[in-house]
Curated annotation (Swiss-Prot):
This protein binds to the 23S rRNA, and is important in its secondary structure. It is located near the subunit interface in the base of the L7/L12 stalk, and near the tRNA binding site of the peptidyltransferase center. Coiled coil: none annotated. This is Large ribosomal subunit protein uL6. The keyword RNA-binding applies. The lineage of its organism: Bacteria, Pseudomonadati, Pseudomonadota, Alphaproteobacteria, Hyphomicrobiales. Disulfide bonds: none annotated. It comes from Rhizobium rhizogenes (strain K84 / ATCC BAA-868) (Agrobacterium radiobacter).
Amino acid sequence: MSRIGKKPVQVPAGITASVDGQKVTAKGPKGELFFVANDEIGLKLEDNAIVVTPLSNSKDARSKWGMSRTMIENILKGVKEGYERKLEINGVGYRAALQGKNLQLALGFSHDVVYEPPEGITIAVPKPTEIVVSGINKQQVGQVAAEIREYRGPEPYKGKGVKYAGERIVRKEGKKK
């Protein structure tokens, strides 16, 4: 029995949610998102809450039960509050700047890296060493942050590179003379 899946997802005030077969649509102040559940998952909207149930007792249905509930909860939070991921840049000469909507990164290569964000993602650069990725889709925000970090991930000797805010880098000791 899924402990996460058992709890109904409460629809917050200010959000309209609708269930149409396997599709849950949520509209809120930040935008509109939808989630299509697996055929083995049943969805019902009752008392301003979405109830998720497995239609069979198979292992596959039970494993997708909790995940479906969490995905619905994520789209409801996304259209109400949105998601953001902060990145930090460490290193001499490493910096970020916005060029229109595109992100321009100086990361020690012979050329600047230009990253074009996908539709629905907003990138802000409050300081040259800070990047804030925000949007309503949690998966997409995390994916964009991971792609930016991938250009120059933090290295273990000096900690130079792009890292998530609050990420702890395991440092290594250099060579002994």
